């Protein structure tokens, strides 16, 4: 979520700064003083942070200035953040009714099956304020391929999944950028190293290496700047990793390298799926189960999570 906030804040800042509009981000990584908040026209923040600010009934001088509330990824209502979003919306609507002070509430989502229910919750006039776009509005057609593994033993299944991932990566290596989603932080580096080692054993590593001297120089300098040891090791081979356990500087470094097409394969957790705009030609979702520590068992990914990852791809495996 912090990665999304940082990206959106930078995007709006670059677009609005020429017009004198001040944009700031407000998260656990970046704090703002009351004076800075008062001078800010657009605040990009997380639900939890805005919940803390808006619930202070003793000081509403800043929240009363808000005239537009945009909730990106509004489908998070079904997630653990759902109650926080509900509280923010309810608090905003109550303030509008008490003060007769209108605030426009906009909800955005790429994966919202029950959009009519959410529209009703946000008090949207469905005749004029509800916009729904089906898949045929997508500018690039999406081809999906699902591969089922019948192996029951965990170790063999993981090995087979690695082999299938390598085969699919090699179908596009050297031609298109590839984004691979894994479901744990450790698995990002393990998967990237497996792909590198497998390609090296088959003498096929050249297809992943930068083809231009400029990209090679960029990756060499990036590897020197990277703080994560696994990232430093992998960058020189044209591979990148991305997860919430990395420093913000490393995450932004990887995002810039992938956007600049300097690295060909990026292995990530779901942090990239939730709003960071890094589309790839091919997306591989390595496994459809994620470990839930609260339930102490493996659970299937929700349809919303799958669709979020699909949204970054032209091809899903």
Predicted regions and their residues:
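Post-DEXD/H (motif II) to motif III coupling segment of the RecA-like Helicase ATP-binding lobe
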Residues: 76-135
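Conserved two-lobed SF2 helicase motor
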Residues: 38-54, 238-241, 260-273
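Conserved small/polar residues in nucleotide/adenosyl-binding loops
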Residues: 315-317
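Conserved helix/coil segment N-terminal to the catalytic DExD/H
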Residues: 29-67
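Conserved C-terminal RecA-like helicase domain
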Residues: 13-24, 186-265, 293, 297-306
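A short beta-strand element within the Helicase C-terminal
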Residues: 265, 272-288
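Conserved nucleic-acid-binding Ia/Ib motif block in the N-terminal RecA-like helicase ATPase lobe
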Residues: 2-44
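Conserved interdomain linker/interface between the two RecA-like ATPase lobes of SF2 helicase motors
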Residues: 104, 115-123, 127-194
